[in-house]
């Protein structure tokens, strides 16, 4: 089967759309930064009302709102604007699957990192200009409580959808407890626990996150079933559990530390215990443009180029003494792979 080549003008138009794709991203970023979707959550407003309540003074305010209509983020009814169903569901603060946290992270950090891509490629340094990258960056992120809260909102965006997939795809019936290593403030752990009432969960992450984790655990009424442990998972004792979950943690570390962590998890688990790993993993048979760009993004943010294939993950997990029981792609925001392995 052959495909008809695009006419020159169509090819040129496609390239033009690509080079101006940031127009769409920045329109969304600014709308969230301004609090537009929160403003319209309770009802529609005119352009003048929006300008007044959000203190917008630029004469292009109406064109900005019309652009959001064209992007299907707003809907227009006469001279009034309201949130589209998607914006109401995902871009209003407090929504159960709020995406605004990651939109703000992309607006305030990732966008600027990508602006330095050329320099990063030529000079060999990560484009973020951060003081630290990889695992060393996280303690610095969490020194300031407000910054830590912003980072948690970014992480929550992804872990909300991942939790749904893990709750559905992993057979939890044979386990009574689990611990999420590097589980941030516990968004994934609490969601999995809510989906499976027989489970008791725990989160192991840096001590600075304890207040935010406690806040979320109380908010979801799980004080008796989910707990937080602060510490260093490479040196401190790991709490006992029937299963260990870890996601987007292993690539932060060089191979020796990764192997050390997997060995420590294996040692901590009982016979029959499960290791549940989810992460961006390369797979030639299913790779998409989104996958490749996400790996590039993660490398720029983390300051390295680490990306492992499904087979490399499987090999490291088996080398640690586990037997892989399940490996499949899951339907979360990043299109992660899920590997479930058992300690014999």
Curated annotation (Swiss-Prot):
Keyword annotations of the record: Antibiotic biosynthesis, Methyltransferase, S-adenosyl-L-methionine, Transferase
Q: Oxidoreductase among the record's keywords? A: no
The entry lists its GO molecular-function terms as: O-methyltransferase activity; protein dimerization activity
Give the UniProt record's GO annotations in the biological process aspect.
antibiotic biosynthetic process; methylation
Any keyword Nucleus? no
Transmembrane feature ranges: none
Which Pfam families does its entry note?
Dimerisation, Methyltransf_2
Q: Binding residues for S-adenosyl-L-methionine, per the UniProt record?
A: 205, 231-233
Q: Which InterPro entries match?
A: COMT-like, O_MeTrfase_dom, Plant_O-MeTrfase_dimerisation, SAM-dependent_MTases_sf, WH-like_DNA-bd_sf, WH_DNA-bd_sf
State the EC number(s): 2.1.1.335
Pathway(s): Antibiotic biosynthesis; oxytetracycline biosynthesis
Catalytic reaction equation(s): 4-amino-4-dedimethylamino-anhydrotetracycline + S-adenosyl-L-methionine = 4-methylamino-4-dedimethylamino-anhydrotetracycline + S-adenosyl-L-homocysteine + H(+); 4-methylamino-4-dedimethylamino-anhydrotetracycline + S-adenosyl-L-methionine = anhydrotetracycline + S-adenosyl-L-homocysteine + H(+)
Q: What happens when the gene is disrupted?
A: Cells lacking this gene are unable to produce the tetracycline intermediate anhydrotetracycline (ATC).
Q: Which Gene3D superfamilies match?
A: Vaccinia Virus protein VP39, Winged helix-like DNA-binding domain superfamily/Winged helix DNA-binding domain
Q: What is this enzyme's class at the first EC digit?
A: transferase
Q: Which PANTHER family match?
A: O-METHYLTRANSFERASE CICE, PUTATIVE (AFU_ORTHOLOGUE AFUA_4G14580)-RELATED
Family per record: Belongs to the class I-like SAM-binding methyltransferase superfamily. Cation-independent O-methyltransferase family.
Role according to the record = Involved in the biosynthesis of the tetracycline antibiotic, oxytetracycline. Catalyzes the dimethylation of 4-amino-4-de(dimethylamino)anhydrotetracycline (4-amino-ATC) to yield anhydrotetracycline (ATC). Also able to catalyze the dimethylation of 7-chloro-, 6-demethyl-, 2-decarboxamido-2-nitrile-, and 4-methylamino-derivatives of 4-amino-4-de(dimethylamino)anhydrotetracycline.
The protein in question is named N,N-dimethyltransferase OxyT
What lineage does the source organism belong to? Bacteria, Bacillati, Actinomycetota, Actinomycetes, Kitasatosporales
